[in-house]
């Protein structure tokens, strides 16, 4: 087996074991409300501006590009349906995850790495504490709470941005029928 695949599989296994440890810890001990709320602010509230700015411009660009593509077929009135579906199903969750991971992931990695270098994680273990419980579980729970809320807001703001462009620049004020589920 090539070395790179072996490294990937070992890393993936380590992540899965860590998630199992986090699940066991949350089930048996719960999480610290103070730490979790602090990380919700860091992960969710402080990521809100970059996520919403990205979403509104994505909705605007998506509306313009969709309108120009559909204009050739005389289906310009379906811009709203397509923008809404694209943002709700694909772009909203993906762009939110990319923005949050880019902003928060580097900070969390740097913070925990700094704690490893200064031996703070070893100090937690030496004092009888569990680093998973103190450092990892609150961050994972905060992410599980923050990311769906950020995604919902991103979808709504992206659709509003697309609607603003559709009404002001594309002169689309037609209210279309709801899209049928597939």
Task: Annotate each predicted stretch with a short phrase.
Residues 29, 63, 67-71, 106, ...:
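Transmembrane helix-loop junctions in multipass membrane proteins, especially transporters and channels
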Residues 112-140:
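Short cytoplasmic-facing helical segments at TM-TM junctions of multi-pass membrane proteins
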Residues 44-95, 99:
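Active-site cofactor/substrate anionic-group-binding motifs, chiefly glycine-
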Residues 27-53:
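Membrane-interface helix starts
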Residues 60, 86-111, 131, 148-164:
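Mid-bilayer segments of alpha-helical transmembrane spans in multi-pass integral membrane proteins
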Residues 173-182:
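Single conserved hydrophobic/aromatic residue that forms the stacking wall/gate
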Residues 44, 48, 52, 91, ...:
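Selective transmembrane-helix segments that form parts of the transport pathway or gating/packing helices
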Residues 1-34:
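Short, membrane-interfacial amphipathic segments enriched in basic
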